[in-house]
Amino acid sequence: MDNFPDRLLELAIQIQQIPAPTLAEGPRGDFVRGRFIEEGLKEVSMDSLGNVYGCLPGKNKKTSPLIISAHLDTVFPEKTNLAVNKESDKVSAPGIGDNSIGVAALFGILWLLRERGIELTGDVWFVADVCEEGLGDLRGMKAVVDHFGANVLAYLVVEGLALGHIYHRAIGVRRYRVTAHTAGGHSWSDYGQPSAVHEIAALVTQLAAIPLPRTPRTTLNVGVMTGGTSVNTLAAEASFDLDLRSEDLSVLAGLAKTAEELISTAAKPEVHFDVEVIGQRPAGEMSAHHPLVKLAETCLHEQGLDVTFTSGSTDANVPLSRGMPALVLGVTTGGGAHTTHEYIDTAPIEQGMGQLLMFVESCFR
């Protein structure tokens, strides 16, 4: 299949050109569903959340299936300029690496299996899932794992920009939306009364000063702040979104407790805070010595690639947190993830697809 990389890139760009912000992946899901049908996959369906499923039957129905997933959604709003810039060694476009090339790789695996006449022992389920990013809270993958359960060979999660990495540890994440309420007023005549904007700014400063351990790696971030009415108004309402992460669940729980206590003590008679949990990503881990992790390592080495064992917050969090075998492998390298300057390197795609094909074929041996 001499033009395989070009075909894969062409499909990735077709996918990338369909806006798919989290919670609005429908049109992209419809496109993938149509392509699954065109490719002749069996039992093609879309569930109530928008996850798309298609089965490549194996020779033995008694063999547990392999689930290969790639998330449909992107971090970019619907009206984002999705223009593509092609260069000799890379393709730049919002969402091309995270995760359009990952979704395209589902088809790439299928094409390579057929081109090389590889018939697998068990079924392979290709899944394009929703709600991986941000406030999606992994609800798509939670539904996928609920659907298939533990009677699987493994969950293989494909991420476009992760080539060379094996994600076998899932970090825990807690997310909050904190809203301050005050009486508000005029910036001159009511000066001295609390402003909700000032209150959240002071609180964020306190949160950012919480000491965090380097090991286990632990982070705190306020990614969004909103509120206020005008430049000369004491804001009656303002809010911020808080993201807490750690490789260790007990450390995460301690950080969450500290943050919640700071929020509680920031309240005053004239200032009320509402706290809403907007995301909880479960943690889990598969040993670096697990046979599937060792297999993934071998597959990368066969492509002449160095291996980095990695922790992260991905769709693999869900099965790993439930004690099921799962890991993340990548398609290529690149950079600028979650920015409009996102890009993928084109040369490593063949190596990336080579390791994915070897992993899928070897899983059933």
Could you say what each language-model-derived stretch is?
Residues 72-86, 152, 168-179, 327-328:
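Acidic-glycine-rich active-site phosphate/pyrophosphate-binding loop
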Residues 188, 195-365:
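Metal-dependent amide/peptide-bond hydrolase catalytic core
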